[in-house]
Amino acid sequence: MLITNPALLGILASLAPLALGAPNQSTQARSRKCVIPSSYTSSQGTADDSPAVAGAFAQCAENSVIIFQEGVDYNIFHPIKATNLSNVEIRVLGNLHLPQDITAVQNIVKSGQNTWFTFQGPRVDWTGADDINNGWINSYGQAWWDANPANSSSFPNRPHLMSYKTSQASIKNFRSRKPIAWNVKLHGDDITVTHAIVDAKSTGGFPFNTDGFDVEGTNISITDSVMYNGDDAIAVNTPSHNIVFARNTIGYQSHGMSIGSLGKDPTDFANITNLRFEDVTVIDALYAARFKSWSGGKGLVKNVVWKNIRVFNVTFPIFVTQSYSDQSASRSGTIDPSSSVMMEDFTWSNFSGSINTYHPGDGSCVTNPCWYNAGLPNLKHTEAIVLECNTESSCKNFRTEGIRLYPQSKDSPSVICMKATAELNPKLGFECKNGTFVPQ
């Protein structure tokens, strides 16, 4: 993508020292090469290539290139686990297929193998095909989504697609088609993700929990990517520092660019700093910019910016809750409702576009009231901004500017604001009360 906007170029240049994670900087050659054979064609798509794949990762675990051949299909009928990798490039030039037998996959997950691909080690790069027709992981999630029981949000024994723990690495052209549920759990330091595609658009049942990237680490960037799914496009979890999410398009029934959820376990102290979400287009989503923490949590999230965000038909463009709940999860132990994950130095700048007034929400609602409407007084679905601070001291130095968000009904945009005090938030940009949004 050629970027010519001088202002945007300046913004991205300013981000570089913060969080555009470093690509592979190893000086050691990848001298070994393992080309993975496939039995897909000879068996008319019935043979399992997992043993050959596992063998390649065992043989070429260090200083190597592991190649899924160009234009070749592979059946990955059993999970692949490679946790002793070092200085390896995984070159995915063909297409990978998970089993289409739901019961067989559920039995594997019940046995304790709940992640289909597990990669771990320093300098582990993923290089997908340049050809858009190749480099796909096909999970056949549509059948799972359609099989989900009515009024249920959690079909049992669904696998996570991938756990990726590395450092000084790059992921390029990662492509996931119809994931069963969670896509990539990305943990580590100095990682760049570019030109990823997550396609979880459904023709039937709702694609619950199809998160794009669940991120935890330092100096991680995700750029120039497209994610259409039914949960967070990115969810930043603790501990995380110096994260950039830029020049991306997200949508379908996405839950947007999220931080959290945090604080469900009050003994887990949240520690997140320096996040940038910039130049992102959000289409038909439930949320665009979102923060979610549980009441009773502890910790600090500091220095967060959402900037230059374009929204089209989004129900909640800007949303903060410090009293989050999950319709499919419960909590145990003693909870102090006056305790919060503290939020400090948050900026929402240059938001433009349309608020979903006529058909708000998404297909994830299985309760009454819907989980995303619970606790919101007099909801009109004209809200440009929702800020739910847990206490009068838990939100500090909030700032909004350039908010140009308008309901499709052509009513005036409104705001729901709780406990973001003027004393702690002198540059909030509007008066913290429920009603018409009037920028100051």
Swiss-Prot record:
Its EC number is 3.2.1.67. GO terms for molecular function: galacturan 1,4-alpha-galacturonidase activity; polygalacturonase activity. One of its GO terms (biological process) is cell wall organization. It is found in: Secreted. Glycans are attached at N24, N84, N151, N219, N271, N313, N350, N434. InterPro entries: Glyco_hydro_28, Pectin_lyas_fold, Pectin_lyase_fold/virulence. Keywords: Cell wall biogenesis/degradation, Disulfide bond, Glycoprotein, Glycosidase, Hydrolase, Repeat, Secreted, Signal. Residues 1-21 form the signal peptide. It is an enzyme of class 3 (hydrolase). The active site is at D231 (proton donor), H255. Pfam families: Glyco_hydro_28. PbH1 repeats lie at residues 217-238, 240-261, 272-293. Disulfide bonds join C389-C395. It comes from the Eukaryota. Specific in hydrolyzing the terminal glycosidic bond of polygalacturonic acid and oligogalacturonates. Belongs to the glycosyl hydrolase 28 family. This is Probable exopolygalacturonase C.
